[in-house]
Amino acid sequence: MSVEIDWDNIRGDLSVNQGVKDFLNSRLQEFELPSYVNNLKVTNFDLGTMPPNVILKQMDDPLDEFYSYLLQEGDISKEAAKDKNTDVQLLVELDYKGDMSIELSADLVLNYPSPQFMILPVKLRISDIGMHCLCLLAYLKKQLFISFLCDVSDPLLENDKLQVDPSGPNFMGKRALERISLIRNIKIHTELGQLDQGEGSVLRSVGKLEEFLVDLFRNLIRKEAAWPSWIDLDFTPEDPEDPEEEGRENDLVADSSNDGKDIEMKSGTEETLGAGIQESVQHVSPAVTSIDQESRVNSNTSLEE
């Protein structure tokens, strides 16, 4: 069963782009940068005009892990956790090959013949992001949990390649897929130097920096959104009488260290989900490339195309 998304409405909400930008910047601060890069930050995020293709595969009750998480966080009581009448979990196949883009800036540091011998401003643009995977969507207690399970075979993405700007022919080649790669195709355009100086000091396709960014973003997405981690979107209405909520905007916020925000990221450890994911995932999508034997999801109701 195909699912249509009102993409224009989503991308028209400026808080979405700003929220993702803030999330990426907050996570970039946690990474140790190599000696040749300083001041790396996201300057712009654009969802693009092309929505993902989403196919509903199965419908079921949410996993116990989601309820345990809400109980641990104090968001629900034990009595509320037993009431599952309005809760639902969807297993969907997500195929995205759109025009989403991420723009970054940084300082490229040349440490030869001496440390910080030269510092050049860098502008980067990440685009042509491709992903095809199975994803869990669980809605319970006014919160939406999103977790990616495994990649799905796709001839257009099988090379798992990194593309660079055509004017710079540096090609980084293939990379081995883990249980889930998520981002399986990326194009990066890089510029060095002050463009407004008019001195032609523009270099393109800096392989080292591009490879670092590809690894960084792939690892970031896997760490934050691939099972046993998930994205938690909280749609609980804010209490206007709560002084702690005063002044908070409805923008997406990606700092999981602050309670009450709209987006939280849960990074889990390798744990089992119960019996059945290998069989159920292979049943609904025989084209799945690989999935960790330790990750298992119960699925009872199948919605085939």
Swiss-Prot record:
Species name: Kluyveromyces lactis (strain ATCC 8585 / CBS 2359 / DSM 70799 / NBRC 1267 / NRRL Y-1140 / WM37) (Yeast)
Bias (Acidic residues): 235-248
Family annotation (Pfam families): MMM1
Keywords: Endoplasmic reticulum, Lipid transport, Lipid-binding, Membrane, Mitochondrion, Mitochondrion outer membrane, Transport
Main localization (coarse): mitochondrion
Source organism superkingdom: Eukaryota
CDD domains for the chain: SMP_Mdm12
Name under which the protein is recorded: Mitochondrial distribution and morphology protein 12
Domain-level remarks: The SMP-LTD domain is a barrel-like domain that can bind various types of glycerophospholipids in its interior and mediate their transfer between two adjacent bilayers.
